Regions:
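Hydrophobic faces of well-ordered beta-strands that scaffold small-molecule active sites
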Residues: 20-24, 49-51, 98-102, 127-129, ...
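Glycine-enriched alpha-helix->loop->beta-strand junction motifs that scaffold or abut catalytic
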Residues: 45, 119-125, 144-152, 169-175, ...
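Glycine-rich phosphate-binding active-site loops on the catalytic face of alpha/beta enzymes
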Residues: 46-56, 124-128, 133, 177-185, ...
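Alpha/beta catalytic cores of nucleotide-metabolism and tRNA/nucleoside-modifying enzymes
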Residues: 199-207, 216-265
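Active-site-adjacent beta->alpha loops and helix N-cap segments on the catalytic face
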Residues: 2-12, 31, 56-67, 77-89, ...
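Histidine/lysine/aspartate-rich catalytic loop segments that bind and position anionic ligands
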Residues: 149-185
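Conserved, mostly hydrophobic/aromatic
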Residues: 22, 41, 49-52, 119, ...
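Catalytic cores of alpha/beta
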Residues: 31-42, 159-168, 211, 215-231
């Protein structure tokens, strides 16, 4: 079973810095570009990579990521084809963890056991399922455990103490703290209150804590990385890819490299 997530965070602890986790939508704008982006991101500064699974009803996604999902679906994205891109990536990149992020419906239609088996075989390390609360994970959890896939939990600022405890106990790999309320990319994260929230969350979990939603600039990455274990940048990167369609890989690599400069503690 893969230990890439644990090994990556342990390495970064020794280097005294947080991880940079860029998010891209699988198949946005097409398979060839996604494969090239995945290939380029580690050298640009990505420590882990999140790949979005496009879905036709993405309730937590803002307009930037919704549009990316629609482009991906129009390009022929399926869960099976995205796993193929991960397999292709893993043939060249043995150590960079890959996290899939999406909604439960595509996984359910694929088949819970089949998904976990195929994802682990392709080289996926963890999964974030936006709409699967701990109370409903029962049918999926045995297959996740058997395959070694980590179930990364989202924790919101609105989560009460008991909810945070339940989510933390259900999580593996790391936990993902949502820095703002609302949909992805809707507004900028308010870093002045984030540190207090993260310090409080550490009382409930020993897992690394990633912070995402609303982080758009290198300055924000620098600020948030000082008190978190990882920083996720999604909508801002997806927007760069959309605005630089013909040079998406070059533009995305430059943007990620700029973000990575702020990660030294």
């Amino acid at each position: 079973m893969s230990q890439r997530i644990e090994n990556t965070f342990e390495k970064l602890r020794r280097e005294n810095r947080a991880a940079l986790i860029p998010f891209i939508m699988g198949y946005d704008p097409d398979a060839t570009t996604t494969a090239a982006l995945l290939d380029a991101l580690p050298a640009a500064g990505a420590d882990l990579i999140e790949i979005g699974i496009p879905f036709s009803e993405p309730m937590a996604d803002g307009p930037v990521i919704q549009a990316a999902g629609l482009r991906a679906l129009a390009a022929g994205a399926t869960l099976h084809s995205i796993l193929g891109l991960v397999r292709q990536f893993r043939a060249k990149h043995a150590d960079t963890p890959i996290i899939l992020m999406g909604y439960f419906n595509p996984l359910y239609r694929y088949g819970n056991e089949r998904f976990c088996t195929d994802a682990a075989a392709a080289g996926v390390d963890g999964i974030i399922i936006v709409d699967l609360p701990p109370e409903e994970e029962g049918e999926l959890k045995p297959y996740l455990d058997a395959s070694g896939l980590k179930l990364i939990r989202l924790i919101a600022p609105t989560s009460g103490a008991e909810r945070v405890k339940l989510l933390s106990q259900s999580a593996s790999g790391f936990v993902y703290y949502i820095s703002i309320t609302g949909i992805t990319g809707a507004k900028a994260a308010q870093t002045d209150t984030l540190k207090t929230q993260i310090d409080h969350l550490r009382q409930s979990t020993d897992l690394p804590i990633a912070v995402g939603f609303g982080i758009k600039t290198a300055e924000q990455v620098k600020t948030v990385s000082a008190f978190s274990d990882a920083v996720v940048v999604g909508s801002a990167l997806v927007d760069v890819i959309a605005r630089n369609k013909n040079e998406a890989v070059k533009a995305a690599s430059a943007f990620v490299s700029e973000l990575a400069k702020g990660l030294k503690r």
